[in-house]
Amino acid sequence: MTITALLVLTGGAYAHNYVANDLSHRSADAALRITDLTLSQVVYDPLPADGQLWLTFEAKAGDPIYMQLGVPYLERLADYRPSLALVGPPGTGNDTVPFALPAGTSARRFDTLERDPVFFDEPFTGTQSWILVEEEFNLPADGTYYIVAFDPAGNGGKLWTAWGKREAFKFRDILNLHNVIRDVRTFHEVQDKRKPFLTWSISTLSSVLDILFFWVR
């Protein structure tokens, strides 16, 4: 059974493409660029105290956006309630945020304090999370946008931000899946726990293919 077959058999689950994070995306000027807003992708971040995670993309009026905010399923994060903001051209929103906005932009804010977290079991990595924000709508204007994750209380904590619904994997993504699974499980602090069978199968097949491809190159 190939990794592709495993992904097809579990097609009802989310299979976000992993986006590497060098932890430098703390301002609009240093925002992580999203090149395809429709592709299902996720970035993990150990948000520092009083810090933000900034992502940016270009869009046209009417373009759809789907975005999520979540935190790892860890006891110490049970009451952690970070927020998400969409920053963009005038008309994006009229909310205030606890950080400086780029000139000529406005913000729409998604707070989570009054929202009920949704438990999420991610079968490919064998990790669990609480989803705090899940929003889908059409963008109001042409221009540059930012997705910003932040903590209104100014505390640090682990979180992830995801966007897009279209699931697509390239061959190099499959070769790297075993490394992604390792990194994601470490972020969720379950790296020392036994992997579920599906996670183990995907990780093992990816590792074997990676080794074989290395030797035939």
Regions found by a protein language model. Name each.
Residues H16-A28, L55, P82-G93, F124-R217:
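C-terminal edge strands of extracellular/lumenal beta-sandwich accessory domains
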Residues V43, A103-N138:
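Extended, solvent-exposed segments with strong compositional bias
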Residues Y80-R109:
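Extended low-complexity, serine/threonine- and proline-enriched intrinsically disordered segments
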Residues W54-R76, T144-P152:
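Hydrophobic beta-strand segments within beta-rich accessory/binding domains
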Residues M1-V8:
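Bacterial N-terminal signal peptides
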